[in-house]
C-alpha cells in the first residue's frame, strides 16, 4: 500500500522547501525552493562551512569594497547551494532575489541577471533556474521583463487574488501562494484556533486562484507553499505543484490515509477580462488587510534573514 507522499506524487509535482541537501536526497522531490531564511538555516550547518569560506574568497577576488564583497558572497553562496541542489533534483531550483530590492524593478532585473550568470559559470543552464521575486507590483513587472528574456520566475509572498491575477497577466512562469501564513493571520485576528482543512482560508485562497487560472487558460503554474499541517496539503491535492518542508514530507510518508484529488483542470471556459493596471492593483491590495500585512511582514523577515546571513559571512572575511 502506498503512503500519502507517494499518492500525492501521482497527481501533483512535489517540491522540497529546503536548502538541506540530505533532506532533498531523502525525499527525492522534482524541484526545490530556497529563500533567505532557508539559506541562513543551511549556512549555520557545519557541513556548509566550506561553502561560506569559498563564497567569501571568491567575493574578495571580485571587489576591493568590503560592502560589495559581502553582497557578492551572499549571491555566490545562494548559487553554490542551489547548484548542489540542482545536481540532485531532476527539475529546477528556485533562488530568491534580495528582498530589499522588492520595490525596485530595475535592481531586481539586474540581480536576476547576476544570479543567472553565476549559475552559468557553475555550468547550470537558465532552464534549470527559477528566479524568485516578491509579488509586489515592482517584482511582478521585473518578472514580466525577465520572462520576455527567457528567464523564468517564481513569484513568491503571494497572499491575494489581485497578486495572482497580475502575475498571470504578466506571463509569470510560476506563483507561490502562501497557505499557512494566511491561516496564521486569520487565527491571530479571529481567535479561532482550529480550522477544518476545507475551511482553511489559505486553502480556499489557493483553490480560488487555481480555478481562476485554469478557467481562463493561464499557463502560469500554481505552486502552493507555506504549509502548517498535512491537512492543508491533502486538501490541495491535484494542484500543479506543492512545495513542502521536510517535516511535513516525513508526515506524509508516514501516513497511509487515502488521498482524494481535490483540484482538477477542466479546461479553459472563460476569456480573460481587462488586465489590472498599477492603480487597480494597489487599490485591491489596500483593501485586503491580510495580504498587505503578510506581504510587508514577509519582505521584512526575508530582508532581516539576509542581513543575518551577511553578518555570518562577515565573520569569514
Swiss-Prot record:
A GO MF term: transaldolase activity
Subcellular location(s) of the protein: Cytoplasm
Pathway annotation: Carbohydrate degradation; pentose phosphate pathway; D-glyceraldehyde 3-phosphate and beta-D-fructose 6-phosphate from D-ribose 5-phosphate and D-xylulose 5-phosphate (non-oxidative stage): step 2/3
Primary residence: cytoplasm
Any Pfam family hit: TAL_FSA
Top-rank EC class of the record's enzyme: transferase
EC numbers for this chain: 2.2.1.2
Gene3D superfamilies, A to Z: Aldolase class I (3.20.20.70)
Catalytic activity: D-sedoheptulose 7-phosphate + D-glyceraldehyde 3-phosphate = D-erythrose 4-phosphate + beta-D-fructose 6-phosphate
Active-site residue numbers: 132 (schiff-base intermediate with substrate)
Keywords: Cytoplasm, Pentose shunt, Schiff base, Transferase
GO biological process, one term: pentose-phosphate shunt
Single GO cellular component term: cytosol
Subunit structure, as described in the record: Homodimer.
Similarity-based family: Belongs to the transaldolase family. Type 1 subfamily.
Matching PANTHER family: TRANSALDOLASE (PTHR10683:SF18)
Protein function: Transaldolase is important for the balance of metabolites in the pentose-phosphate pathway.
Name of this protein: Transaldolase
